[in-house]
């Protein structure tokens, strides 16, 4: 299996024109299509894996260009930003120490995201429980966080980890999943920031959908529940190929 990973415009090692008008979901969908064409991938060999924000992109791409995809992998992303926000508010926040949550909320209310206290609380009380549960984070995670484009992240996601408040606030394709006819696996993990039961429901809405739960993982379950994640992913690809 050949795995191709690319940095989108304004991300990682790609150019960053610092033009916020380019921070647009439809444009990013066309970027995926440009990469596909350049690599000469098609329905015979193209599996699209989208994780987190990439899951939003993968769903949107499939709704427009599914004729080009052999298989779709939606990893750790719900099909509704409002439902994600609801889960963050009603479930995730209640798992946190109330005093810690109050401090985080106060910092967010004051837009004081650069305060060292903010990440100082988020990392042990949220990231280490719901983003990656390994005691020492793998180097690629640290590297990707070090290269984050904060302007882009805040523009699309919003500054807070508790739900989406940026351009994607009202994004919701839950009613359109039935239109994605491509074989699809929906992957989630017990400790993810996403709602595992909602993700399971998503798989039932896809005509050729299946669900994979990583019981010990979180948002980056390809690291913290790697055996289950990779075995399930490879099994899906082999099943579609055959």
Segments and roles (model prediction):
Residues 72-113:
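Flexible "cap/lid" loop of the alpha/beta hydrolase fold
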Residues 11-14, 80, 194, 220:
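Active-site loop signature of alpha/beta-hydrolase-fold enzymes
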Residues 5-53, 57:
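Active-site loop/oxyanion-hole signature of alpha/beta-hydrolase fold enzymes
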Residues 95, 102-178, 182:
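Alpha/beta-hydrolase
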Residues 208-242:
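Catalytic active-site module of serine/aspartate enzymes centered on a nucleophile-bearing elbow/loop
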Residues 1-3:
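Short amphipathic alpha-helix adjacent to the substrate-entry channel of hydrolases
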Residues 174-217:
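Conserved loop-alpha-helix segment in the C-terminal half of the alpha/beta-hydrolase fold
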Residues 44-87:
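Conserved hydrolase catalytic core segment
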């Amino acid at each position: 299996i050949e795995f191709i990973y690319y940095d989108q415009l304004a991300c990682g090692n790609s150019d960053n024109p610092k033009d916020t008008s380019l921070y647009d979901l439809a444009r990013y969908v066309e970027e995926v299509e440009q990469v596909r064409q350049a690599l000469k991938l098609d329905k015979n060999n193209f599996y699209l894996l989208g994780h987190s924000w990439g899951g939003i992109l993968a769903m949107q791409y499939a709704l427009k260009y599914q004729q080009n995809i052999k298989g779709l992998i939606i990893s750790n992303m719900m099909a509704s930003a409002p439902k994600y926000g609801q889960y963050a508010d009603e479930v995730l926040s209640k798992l946190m120490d109330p005093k810690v949550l109050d401090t985080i909320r106060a910092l967010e209310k004051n837009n004081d995201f650069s305060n060292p206290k903010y990440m100082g609380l988020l990392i042990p009380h949220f990231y280490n429980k719901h983003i990656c549960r390994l005691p020492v984070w793998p180097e690629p995670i640290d590297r990707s966080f070090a290269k984050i484009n904060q302007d882009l992240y805040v523009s699309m996601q919003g500054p807070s980890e508790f739900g989406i408040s940026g351009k994607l606030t009202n994004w919701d394709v839950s009613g359109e999943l039935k239109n994605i006819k491509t074989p699809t696996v929906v992957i989630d993990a017990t400790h993810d920031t996403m709602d595992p039961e909602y993700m399971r429901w998503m798989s039932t809405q896809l005509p050729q959908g299946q669900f994979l739960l990583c019981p010990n993982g979180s948002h980056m379950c390809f690291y913290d529940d790697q055996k289950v994640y990779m075995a399930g992913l490879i099994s899906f690809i082999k099943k579609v190929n055959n």
